[in-house]
Regions:
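Bacterial N-terminal signal peptides that target proteins for export
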Residues: 1-10
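N-terminal, post-signal-peptide segments of secreted/periplasmic proteins
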Residues: 23-153, 158-160, 325-326
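Extracellular beta-strand/beta-solenoid scaffold signature
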Residues: 107-133, 149-156, 171-194, 205-217, ...
Length: 327
């Protein structure tokens, strides 16, 4: 009996030690884009190789602001649960930029071909040239980053339970700032793969589309973000586009200076509430069934709300307690 108890205790201690050893912290204190220790590329490669839960990549402020990591080629896809944190944000509110302009060349959206290489532009299907790629991975956190000058800033593809919070997502043309999509690789939706992600408290500035929820993305929360476009944006399209995305919640955001503040194409049962939409060509541009628009402020747009025809004659859109004026 004593021998069995000893063996059991040894096994438990071994498992505990293994668990403690599995989570690692990788420090990024060099901004050169190479695979040497201390670079962002090295840190992602190390985390992917470890593939354990709750790794952390801490990106330090190096030198004087602005803090910019300029990439010379695409980063590795993120394959493990990891927190990637720009450490300056908690201290001063400053972001550390990850910039793709060294290798993504061309004029605006023309530098970003779609899935069909002969097409380009915000409203063609694409997963081309993203900055950070979360594909078939869960439990990733991105915080304190400025993800800048890619075709897609962050691609969340068939991935769930990820958190994107307190970032600046800027100047990503041709696709979107953040794309959450269940795309199976052939343009078909997958309904249970891109769920329960949270996009909170971010600044979306001068992206083609600010954010997309497409091809099966469901039960995601997008809250308390600013979606804005300036005259520097060559193709301001939608603040948020929902395409075959269902049961998502879009709450407490502000949309300004876009073609459409928020557009839904064939989405169902999305809850859109407590948002402000101003100075867009169209505030809400809608099709779909069972979508609810509750307590939004829609003002100063060229057209406040456009409800387009839906092939399902029984489709319903609910507008309740919204303030709509000056459109």
């Amino acid at each position: 009996m004593k021998l069995s108890a000893l063996r059991l205790s040894t096994l438990i201690l071994s498992l505990l030690a293994s668990g403690l050893a599995s989570a690692e912290t990788y420090i990024v204190d060099r901004y050169q884009d190479d695979s040497a220790k201390g670079s962002l590329r090295w840190a992602i490669e190390q985390s992917n190789a470890n593939a354990a839960h709750e790794n952390e990549i801490q990106i330090q402020a190096v030198g004087k602001a602005p803090y910019v990591i300029k990439l010379n080629q695409a980063l590795p896809r993120i394959k493990s649960s990891v927190k990637i944190i720009g450490m300056q944000w908690d201290k001063t509110g400053e972001f550390i930029a990850i910039d793709g302009s060294n290798y993504i060349k061309g004029e605006g959206a023309k530098a970003c071909p779609g899935a069909n290489s002969e097409q380009y532009g915000t409203n063609v299907r694409t997963t081309t040239l993203p900055g950070l790629v979360l594909q078939d991975v869960n439990g990733v956190t991105l915080k304190g980053l400025d993800i800048h000058r890619f075709c897609i800033g962050v691609l969340v593809n068939r991935s769930s339970n990820n958190l994107i919070q307190h970032n600046r997502i800027s100047n990503n043309y041709g696709g979107s700032g953040v794309m959450l999509t269940g795309d199976d690789g052939k343009g078909n939706p997958t309904s249970t793969t891109t769920n329960n992600n949270k996009v909170l408290n971010n600044l979306f500035v001068d992206n083609g589309d600010g954010l997309e929820l497409t091809r099966g993305a469901a039960f995601n929360l997008v809250a308390n973000n600013l979606f804005t476009s300036t005259k520097a944006n060559p193709e301001p399209s939608q603040g948020i586009e929902i395409l075959w995305g269902n049961d998502n919640a879009v709450i407490g955001n502000k949309f300004e200076n876009y073609s459409d503040g928020l557009q839904i194409n064939w989405g169902k049962r999305n809850y859109i509430a407590y948002n402000e939409l101003t100075n867009n060509s169209i505030g809400f541009n809608l099709t779909g069934d069972g979508n609810i628009f509750d307590s939004n402020k829609v003002h100063g747009n060229r057209l406040g709300i456009a409800i387009r025809s839906e092939k399902d004659a029984n489709a319903r859109t609910t507008l309740t307690k919204n303030l709509i004026w000056g459109n």
